[in-house]
């Protein structure tokens, strides 16, 4: 079975070699059929600490790296702009 890939936004980089990535999923409401945005947060391994808050990244599913970390950052798609 292929590994899953997701694209999301880095919302926290406070940990060492770990970032929290928020992934948005748009699904229709079961009763009202309106498109609803659901957000899930995943902890992802960032070996070189390259990711910053606001970066758009691609993450790849991996075997468990810790109690809550099951994803690895593949690459940074868009870097956050610093004002």
Swiss-Prot record:
Q: Which family does it belong to?
A: Belongs to the universal ribosomal protein uS17 family.
Oligomeric and partner information = Part of the 30S ribosomal subunit.
Name listed for the protein in its UniProt record: Small ribosomal subunit protein uS17
Source species of the chain: Gloeobacter violaceus (strain ATCC 29082 / PCC 7421)
Entry GO CC: cytosolic small ribosomal subunit
MF GO annotations: rRNA binding; structural constituent of ribosome
Q: In the record, which residues are listed under signal peptide? A: none
Q: Which InterPro entries match?
A: NA-bd_OB-fold (IPR012340), Ribosomal_uS17 (IPR000266), Ribosomal_uS17_bact/chlr (IPR019984)
Q: Name one Pfam family in it.
A: Ribosomal_S17
Q: Which GO terms describe its biological process?
A: translation
Main function: One of the primary rRNA binding proteins, it binds specifically to the 5'-end of 16S ribosomal RNA.
Which keywords accompany this UniProt record?
Ribonucleoprotein, Ribosomal protein, RNA-binding, rRNA-binding
What the entry lists under NCBIfam families is as follows: PRK05610.1, uS17_bact
- CDD domains assigned: Ribosomal_uS17
């Amino acid at each position: 079975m292929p590994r899953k890939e997701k694209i999301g936004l880095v919302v926290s980089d406070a940990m060492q070699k770990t970032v929290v990535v928020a992934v948005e999923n748009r699904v229709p409401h079961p009763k009202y059929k309106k498109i609803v945005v659901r957000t899930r947060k995943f902890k992802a391994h960032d070996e070189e600490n390259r990711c910053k808050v606001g970066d758009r990244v691609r993450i790849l599913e991996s075997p468990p790296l810790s109690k809550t970390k099951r994803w690895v950052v593949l690459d940074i798609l868009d870097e956050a702009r610093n004002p």
